[in-house]
């Protein structure tokens, strides 16, 4: 428990300090996906709130742990009186006088039997703490998935921007060539104008692609709670994608049931519902407690001889000890209804667990089929790029030899550009889908 508490406090108190060091180094080197995820976990507000809730559950465990100990309370009082009253020190006659009374006391109470309420409250608090920790783990998983999606989106937009820039270079080369041909009368003004329009269109596409990249980088930096995206760069992934055999959905589901935070939290809360029922049932049992006390006082009265303070405290000391038994007989069916409510809550928690398992299985199935489709799409896009590269190469040679028009050349160029863009999209779609499957298998996303 102490280790858990230390971890929660570290997340709450030191996350900002640790992260600020990384933020200062944001411009020094590219960030890996793992670095982005770790940084987001340290700074995300939702995670810090969830960690705070888990820390509160830890306090509740500590409170219930010591609730079986005796309590000890002290009391002190001071009263003054004046007027006609019976004397407590002399003959007991009624006289006009003023008096002062100082009282002191200690009392304690020990619960001997509470109908098993206290041990069940302690067990419930421990299970609630475990569930709260799993809630924290789920919050970390959620931010990891969000960061992964945003990270890959940045890389995707960056590659599209590079493709757009390369298309400008190709268009400018062709414009330069057509200008040369125009000067010697081998190209028409319409062809030159069309080439100029193509350059302008490619430049506009490049500006849009670059803007998309900057916006996605801004989204990621905001997700990481970075003050600015300036100087924030990402590591480039491997050029070649390694395709591994996909684990069957049923096997992934079996693995996920053993560790998935959402499932574990639901299981802990369902287990705790048994304690909640026993806590409600404890009101059916008699309650037995032991109590004791010490009290003394110091009294003075005008016109009378008063013994010393210490003497009176000693002589007036009284002691008491007793046992209190409270037997429930009829409480307007309140206990019965509380037990019914606890059992209904248990049924609701059981349904929630069942729903969580079914939802998990559906998510794994969808992730698996999406990964299969993404792999097929990438393979198809590879073939499309190869075919369009060959077609564009042939069309370039024909255009340079004057055997094709600029329209035909431009169409081949656009087809190649689309094929390259489709391959980039398929590449990052597969990377994301495969990481989702790794996530369900309990592997660290990096």
Which residues make up each language-model segment?
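Sec/SRP-type N-terminal targeting helices
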Residues: 48-52, 65, 98, 112-140, ...
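Bacterial Sec-pathway N-terminal export signals of envelope proteins
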Residues: 23-73, 77, 83, 228, ...
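Bacterial Sec-dependent N-terminal signal peptides
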Residues: 1-33, 445-446
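Periplasmic alpha-helical coiled-coil/stalk elements that build and connect Gram-negative outer-membrane
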Residues: 142-255, 370, 374, 416
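Short segments within alpha-helical structural elements
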Residues: 52, 62, 201-226, 385-443
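Small/polar, glycine/serine/threonine/aspartate-rich low-complexity segments that form flexible
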Residues: 24-29, 75-110, 236-245, 278, ...
